[in-house]
Amino acid sequence: MRKTLPSIGALGFSNTNAEKDLCCLGWYSNDPDTVVDAPEQAAEILWHLSGTADPDLALNTIIRLMEALGEQKGQLHNALRTDPELRVKLFSLLGASTALGDHLVAHPHTWPELQRPMPTRQEMFRLMLGSVGAARASFSSESQQPQGSDSDSEFSFGADLSADDTANTDLSTPGTYRAEITGERAEVALKTTYRSLLLRIAAADLAGTYPEDIHRTGLPEVPFVTVTKALADLADAALTAALAVAVAHVYPEGEVDTHLAVMAMGKCGAQELNYISDVDVIFVAEPVTPKAIRLAGEFIRIGCACFFEVDAALRPEGKHGVLVRTLDSHVAYYKRWAETWEFQALLKHRPMTGYMPLGQAYSEKLQPMVWEASQRESFVDNVQRMRRRVLENVPAKLKNLELKLGEGGLRDVEFAVQLLQLVHGRSDESLRTLSTIDALNALIEGGYVGREDGAELIRAYEFLRLLEHRLQLQKVKRTHTMPEATKTKQLRWLARAAGFKTSKLASATDEMNAMLKTSRLHISSLHRKLFYRPLLDSVVNISVGTLKLSPAAAKLQLAALGYVFPDRAMDHLHALAAGGSRKAKIQAMLLPTLMEWLSETAEPDAGLLNYRKLSDAAYDRTWFLRMLRDEGVVGQRLMRILGNSPYTADLIISAPDIVKQLGDGATRPKLLETSEDRVTKSIVAAAARHDDPDVAIAVARSLRRAELARIASADLLQMLSVQQVCRRLSYVWDAVLEAGLQAEIRASLIGSTGDKNSVPPARIAVIGMGRLGGSELGYGSDADVMFVCEPTEGVSDEAAVKWAIGVCDSMRSRLAKPSGDPPLDVDLGLRPEGRSGAVVRTLESYKQYYERWGEVWEIQALLRADFIAGDQELGARFLEMIEPLRYPEAGVSQKVIREVRRMKARVDNERLPRGADRNTHTKLGRGALTDVEWTVQLLTMMHAHEFQDLHNPSTLDSLDVIEKHAVIEPEKVEVLRQAWLTATRARNAIVLVRGKRVDQLPQQGTQLAAVAGAAGWEPSDSQQYLDHYLKVTRRARQVVDEVFWGVDSIEHDY
């Protein structure tokens, strides 16, 4: 006997009771003397059983089913021996679905239903309606009067209610029926019949992915579209029966006083339904009576109780809108108030049940509006925002497990296909299809998508839907989340249920995971395949299948992708990719991917133009296109920069070698591999090789330009914090001043002595002030400095100062010469006596001035003074000299504090430009930079004599010290810190976008979106970015009022 029957181990059972259960069924024996009836048939049964997704589950359910059948189990026994098709269907079903197995055990006499083919639409209607004894409903005379909800408006046309209802006496069609039974009895009948029909569909579907081999015969695979269409038909039939029960409940005696049509939306509307899915509906009625509203509500209640969630949230105004509207009311809403997403939702609508002529009228009136949606002014912004929302609400830990919402998931395909339908369906009626697969096929046939790309996407989409279906069937619950990698048993079950087999090379799970990874990759690249590749192919006239995107269609597509000037974008594409050169061919290969990345930036048009300029600038650099081709991260980062920051784009175009640094090094991004100290030394050393100051400054400018490009790129790519950006910008300025000062001294000595190594008349130190002194410069900051000199031995103070003034003035003039680079303005406004004071003073002169005449504002300015260039020893002595001035041993007097507050009041009242918005002025606005910095400086003046570590010029470092010593509450320190960082990042972002310093945040619109993008936000979230800025600075102003002014009010009298 053992020679005929396979062993338990070979069959793959793991349950300890498996052998006993198989013996009880008469299919197995571990006793050689025991004869199993028809052993060859028993072997076939055993092999078929072991091929299920979970043989133990299937066996356990069969035991329960046989027990439930009692004396009639022999019929099932005989059928399993003689009917291989039944074996495959039953075993596949029981091994894949606990819930449907339980249904079969609860209704054991329905097993012969599995011997029948998948139910037809007409059969499902007959069975569902027959289960509640339905018959055609009759309508009252009042229901024949259409109710024009906007009878006096341009939208009023009423509805023709003279057409017969589509309900049929043979119960095979949708329509308005009346059930014979209601209440719990009806609901039990509906549930049972629905599950039995679902069971037949699932059995046929699962049998199609049953693994066939030498031991097992399978059945032909049921096409995905056939399954989803059958599930949608079942939903139609089920809800038609639910409506019949609702009619009997709401109108128990009389005739129906309304014509109610139910419109299917979403996947049900598109006839691509899942096993378990919400069914979205919209109601239209003529007239809308109180009972019509009750009828719709009862319809939803019964559907939810018996089948699945019935959701009417896609109706006008969503859950806040009325449940039932007239046709006029629907039309009026969509003409006046509907948003873009609502027209996108209407892509999938169709009349489902109820009074079908009214449903058809609904479609005829609203469908044309769908195809005009792409002409709406807000279409592009809305579409891009909807696309970004796909991933937003998915928890990070689930993104790789999500079949629907994760990256490379089902929603990506559905969204992309719908967008192409909206863009091109206005002029091409062949694209006006409901289902995703039909739409993709239409796009392929219409030449909008290449045949190979389209077929690849269809395969990937259907595979993900297959996995989704198998996951849902297990417990007949809504889910689209893959099991975690650690749940090997669940993954093995899913792989087998989906038809994967273990081979010598890989397990079924490994095979499934590999195909899932490949499918996700195909889908994640779909925007290139569906949107950008056809554009490039139309430009370079590549023949891919039947691809024939016309210039007009290409421009439509570009506009939908966010390009404001599609004509210009097409010109750029022609310039880059047209022609037969090797470079053009590589560009044609790269651009679909690059353009997809550009579409996520604030200004795709500007980004594409910048890329064209950069390609021209790098034309002779053979590494450029090769690097973009071989290192994907370089291209992605480059597009983010080019599309978000004109300032950085210009810098990179003038220094293309920076692109080499956009890749990753061994341990970190290449942009971060060079230290600030090395940058400073290289700028100074390179300039020092040239005696001509113009050449030396030009060299320093060139290296500064490259370094600014590097810093700005790292900033835009979120590789640097605000504090790191400011520090690096400050060090670059320090290096340029050092290089410029040395160049002028060399030139002066060569001119006067002929020897650049001779002893100069004086030593010069450059003292950084303001944000330069605190190493907190922004992109648009000037260099606030003071010059101090000390005569060389034998040189008078007057001669030394005169010579130093000549050197410093010459350096300032040379640095300030107009050029294509960001400006190099050296500002002396914080020196003693301000702009009317001497350009250069000796150390003793500074000391005498500050001790005799220094005003409070001048002493306050010294809080941020630090040595940055020139003679280091002289600079250190200057700082030593001012130490007791800016940090008095006994602290500052109340008089000084009052004076500081008086000056701040003047700044608040007088310095803000006319017409400026105080709420969004990043420098002088409420809670912005000036507020925070003055508050920190006042606290420093008041407490520096107590805490030595407050003796530093940095605002952020001082805040850390203030928090460390609990000068004010930590919460308040954090509020001030975040306000300073937020305002500084905003100021930097404005320069990155505008190319110059602007203190005011732009108003809502493209400029604000660009600033938000440069500040690390999604451009589409510009309003949230603005709200965040206002919230942070508003909180900071409250702290400033309390800490700086010592009051709760922002009104000050000083």
Curated annotation (Swiss-Prot):
Residues 138-150, 165-175 have a biased composition (Polar residues). One of its GO terms (molecular function) is magnesium ion binding. Residues 138-175 are annotated as: Disordered. It holds the Pfam family GlnE. Residues 1-535 are annotated as: Adenylyl removase. Gene3D superfamilies: Beta Polymerase, domain 2, Nucleotidyltransferases domain 2. GO terms for biological process: regulation of glutamine family amino acid metabolic process. GO terms for cellular component: cytosol. SUPFAM superfamilies: Nucleotidyltransferase (SSF81301), Nucleotidyltransferase substrate binding subunit/domain (SSF81593). It comes from the Bacteria. Its EC number is 2.7.7.89, 2.7.7.42. Belongs to the GlnE family. NCBIfam families: PRK14109.1. This is Bifunctional glutamine synthetase adenylyltransferase/adenylyl-removing enzyme. The gene is glnE.
